[in-house]
């Protein structure tokens, strides 16, 4: 079973409170999501493997550590996931970026796929799938289905806010996936929104309604 972890670092929690506030404007919301994502990238990459290499400093030859193992790809779930990409690239600037596009049908609350563009070597990469919200879990489950169908196997999912219903649904459907969130909220309301949540992350990131 993959792990589930709430990243309760004080800076993450402080910045998350700022974006939860309904009067937080687009500029600040976008900046805070970027900063939270950078902090989350630091936390979720703790188990990336290292190997020894020989280098020469200005003083002497030395054995030091460098990243080993699979290369990295960041995969945002469009469109709101785009807001988390730059934060991850701040920490892992050489990562490739794929895209998975889907929208939520407002009547059924189920996701509908409309776009997939991934690195050609996706099966050989450690994937960090990012989406600010894990509500019903439908979009995340469909994204995992799409990625696994294309050969991906080493996947971590990151969100800012999750509902218990979404966490359960995702872990039931994909028990091998590690799931990280900055907050586990109370429940979903009748419209499928996380309570207390932070509203529609996509609209708040891009200034739309």
Swiss-Prot record:
Cofactor binding remark: Binds 1 Mg(2+) ion per subunit. The magnesium is bound as Mg-PRPP.
Keywords: Allosteric enzyme, Glycosyltransferase, GTP-binding, Magnesium, Nucleotide-binding, Transferase
Cofactor(s) needed by this chain: Mg(2+)
Keyword RNA-binding: no
Organism domain of life: Bacteria
Annotated control of activity: Allosterically activated by GTP.
Residues reported in the UniProt entry to bind uracil: 194, 199-201
UniProt-annotated binding residues for 5-phospho-alpha-D-ribose 1-diphosphate: 79, 104, 131-139, 200
Role according to the record: Catalyzes the conversion of uracil and 5-phospho-alpha-D-ribose 1-diphosphate (PRPP) to UMP and diphosphate.
Protein family (similarity comment): Belongs to the UPRTase family.
Name of the protein: Uracil phosphoribosyltransferase
Organism ancestry: Bacteria, Bacillati, Bacillota, Bacilli, Lactobacillales
